[in-house]
């Protein structure tokens, strides 16, 4: 009898060991994904959180109208698991969107349009040159924010000395860690792809004007920078857009948006249907 009990205990211990090993293997080797695609914005776009002057109309996301001193933001409603505390793994992601900046005058345009990654409880920050995302030109690790800015107005306190419009990568500060001069094509649709490679920590930004009529101008731009996301942003984040105007202004519109991320070593998946 004792021998049978011993055998049963041994069996259950072996079974428990195999079960725990299987669960651990599944957790380590599975991938958590988040995906969504918005090809046309609806008036009651339920998977967006609007802040400030942001709203949807006529199939577009409007962040600002061409009026002075406005801030408009829109966030994806579901938080994104951008890195995993248990495994230390960081997500690969790619997001693509089309946007238009349309100003009454091509010479007097302001201020900024940006895609950003921020804490889940993010709120609109200082407007004007601060994107509605930051409050200071100084590095502030408590900001926990990464932004890709499309800057149409020169701010001497932090912008590149060449005074050109530019694409910038911002890490916890409005002062970009890297920039690329950019020729705004007023009223033209721009296609943007932003990709993050978790193996190299390289964030890559590409902007193209597919329908440009300005043949003499550069119509494609690429910018890269090493951004250690795990050291900058929280484990769970929100992603979204922000745009601002000041004394000068422009309408800032997003016409489509898609996002896909993959985080290894977790065990859940979130998929959002096309909207």
Curated annotation (Swiss-Prot):
Coiled-coil blocks: none
PROSITE patterns: LECTIN_LEGUME_ALPHA, LECTIN_LEGUME_BETA
Residues that hold D-glucose according to the record: 111, 129, 246-247
Pfam families the record matches: Lectin_legB
This protein's record includes keyword Endoplasmic reticulum: no
Family: Belongs to the leguminous lectin family.
Chain positions recorded as Ca(2+) binding sites: 151, 153, 155, 159
GO MF, any single term: calcium ion binding
Protein name stated in the entry: Lectin
Species for this entry: Lens culinaris
Key words of the record: Calcium, Lectin, Manganese, Mannose-binding, Metal-binding, Signal
Other information: Binds two manganese (or other transition metal) ions and two calcium ions per heterotetramer. The metal ions are essential for the saccharide-binding activity.
Function according to Swiss-Prot or TrEMBL: D-mannose specific lectin.
Domain of life: Eukaryota
Disulfide bridge partners, by residue number: none
Binding site for Mn(2+): 149, 151, 159, 166
Quaternary structure and interacting proteins, as annotated: Heterotetramer of two alpha and two beta chains.
Propeptide: 211-217, 270-275
PTM statement from Swiss-Prot or TrEMBL: The mature form consists of two chains, alpha and beta, produced by cleavage of the immature protein. These remain cleaved, yet fold together to form one subunit.
Record-annotated site: Cleavage: 210-211, 217-218
Cleaved signal peptide residues: 1-30
Single Gene Ontology BP annotation: carbohydrate mediated signaling
């Amino acid at each position: 009898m004792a021998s049978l009990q011993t055998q049963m205990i041994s069996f259950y211990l072996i079974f428990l060991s195999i079960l725990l090993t299987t669960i651990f293997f599944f957790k380590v080797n599975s991938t958590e994904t988040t995906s969504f695609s918005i090809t046309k914005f609806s008036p009651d776009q339920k998977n967006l959180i609007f802040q400030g002057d942001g709203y949807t109309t006529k199939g577009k996301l409007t962040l600002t109208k061409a009026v002075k001193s406005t801030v408009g933001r829109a966030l994806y409603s579901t938080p994104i698991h951008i890195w995993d505390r248990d495994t230390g793994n960081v997500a690969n992601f790619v997001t693509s969107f089309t946007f238009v900046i349309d100003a009454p005058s091509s010479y007097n345009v302001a201020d900024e349009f940006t895609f950003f990654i921020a804490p889940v409880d993010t709120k609109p920050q200082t407007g004007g040159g601060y994107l509605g995302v930051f409050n200071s030109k100084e590095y502030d690790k408590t900001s926990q924010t990464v932004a890709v800015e499309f800057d149409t107005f020169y701010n001497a306190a932090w912008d590149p000395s060449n005074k050109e419009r530019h694409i910038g990568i911002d890490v916890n500060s409005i002062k970009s860690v890297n920039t690329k001069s950019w020729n705004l094509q007023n009223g033209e649709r721009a296609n943007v792809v932003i990709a993050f490679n978790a193996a190299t920590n390289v964030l890559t930004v590409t902007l193209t004007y597919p329908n440009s009529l300005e043949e003499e101008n550069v119509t494609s731009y690429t910018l890269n920078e090493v951004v250690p996301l795990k050291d900058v942003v929280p484990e769970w984040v929100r992603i979204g857009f922000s745009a601002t105007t000041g004394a000068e202004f422009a309408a800032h519109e997003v016409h489509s948006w898609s996002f896909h991320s993959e985080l290894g070593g977790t065990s859940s998946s979130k998929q959002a249907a096309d909207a």
